[in-house]
């Protein structure tokens, strides 16, 4: 199948990056809901096999150094890793703690970061084994990693999650739980939190995190923003919303220099050969933030 990859307005972020020197202490964070592979999407022209090369090209083009994913099934994550030389990932399946079900995997460049430790917990009052928490309709999992930036020796934690899409209490309790875990694991070490939170910037569960004094939304911290759309598109290239349900939060030791909702699309040639249909790589737009190491970083 012939692909024409069309870089949208989000290309400006990469152009801006190219205008400044590439210092070792700077890197790009991403969060990307990949949309789980299913037959229904394939029947409507949005199958994973079709989308995978576009997503991989998008990640390479925007030069994600480390990024959280949501809804990735094991075979999807293996395929994405194979399509991204120089990257690997951590994370387990939410259904059995092994490979079954959706993952909240974290991908990272192996030449830039050394993995020091990692783990997973369920968004539940029983976080150490597969289960559904509170009023959630599905099991939900958070994956975390402790990383060292190789060139500087700086150490940080990254947490990545996917909150429930139905349970209101589950989302609020999940926000409290992840903040508790961040404080427990990091002990003052700088932290990144990414994910599909299934709530936008007006919701109480979002505010629990953003007003916690532990983390802040990169959207609010960035002097340069390119957010011409929200983050859930439902596979509609022409959709428009101001609602951002996919977020990147960082602790105070990071300096954020840019933020973007990446609205890139691609084109598929129809059978007639005379018309092209715009497609989004997933039913969510990925989010990217450029950050720098600031005060409070140390090597371990």
Regions found by a protein language model. Give the residues of each.
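Metal-dependent phosphoester/phosphodiester hydrolase catalytic core
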Residues: 137-141, 148-172, 176, 184-185
